[in-house]
Amino acid sequence: MGKQLRNQRHRALMAAVASTRIRAGLTQRDLAARLGRAHSFVGKVESGERQLNVLEFCELADALKVSATVLLSKVLRG
């Protein structure tokens, strides 16, 4: 398997993160600041270059001020 996972659910995750961030009025830099990470982290997550573990997913949801359950439901709906 290559460096970038490009299955349907991973693409749905990338889209859910980006759309939720944009709907919240945040830039990638804003979200990265909330996470205490470099802005490239958010860009890599949204582009599919970086996968998230479950704890990072929960931290991301918290930073977006949505529940992890809501964010996950967006991913599962595709």
Show where each model-derived region lies:
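Helix-turn-helix/winged-helix DNA-binding modules
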Residues: 23, 49-52, 63
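A short, Lys/Arg-rich alpha-helix, primarily the initiator
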Residues: 1-23
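Short amphipathic recognition helices of helix-turn-helix/homeodomain-type DNA-binding modules
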Residues: 70-78
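DNA major-groove recognition helix of helix-turn-helix/homeodomain DNA-binding modules
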Residues: 55-70
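Conserved hydrophobic/aromatic packing and binding residues within compact polymer-binding modules
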Residues: 17, 31-32, 42-45, 71
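Recognition helix of helix-turn-helix/homeodomain-like DNA-binding domains
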Residues: 35-52
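Short basic helix-loop element that most often maps to the first helix and adjoining turn
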Residues: 15-34, 59
